[in-house]
């Protein structure tokens, strides 16, 4: 079997994250991009807020509630990301960080691995 190119691996992670968002969180992004930066996988998702989320985000308390709820849901599913990274890259996931903008509906996900992915996919 031919090894994956960097673009193929990034695209595979993008598709897996879109599937995760739809299955676990109920809605997929309008746009998704994945980038390898040293030992990190940077994922940018746009258009994640529902009409209800946008209404909730009109107050500061609602914004905090939205961010915290989404963060907890996301971080409770870390095993999904461990498997995704292992299957796609053969690397081990070290940590997961995420935040969502309650104004734009953009989520940034940073996955740190045990391998320099830029060197792995030269």
List the model feature ranges, each with a label.
Residues 1-122:
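Interaction-mediating elements
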């Amino acid at each position: 079997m031919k090894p994956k190119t960097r673009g193929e691996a990034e695209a595979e992670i993008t598709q897996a994250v879109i599937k995760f968002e739809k299955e676990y969180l109920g809605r997929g992004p309008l746009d998704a991009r994945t980038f390898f930066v040293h030992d990190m996988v940077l994922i940018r998702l746009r258009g994640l807020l529902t009409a209800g989320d946008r209404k909730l985000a009109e107050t500061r308390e609602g914004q905090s509630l939205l961010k915290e709820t989404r963060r907890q849901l996301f971080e409770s599913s870390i095993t999904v990301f461990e498997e995704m990274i292992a299957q796609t890259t053969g690397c081990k996931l070290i940590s997961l960080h995420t935040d969502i903008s309650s104004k734009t509906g953009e989520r940034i996900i940073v996955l740190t691995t045990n391998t320099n992915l830029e060197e792995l996919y030269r």
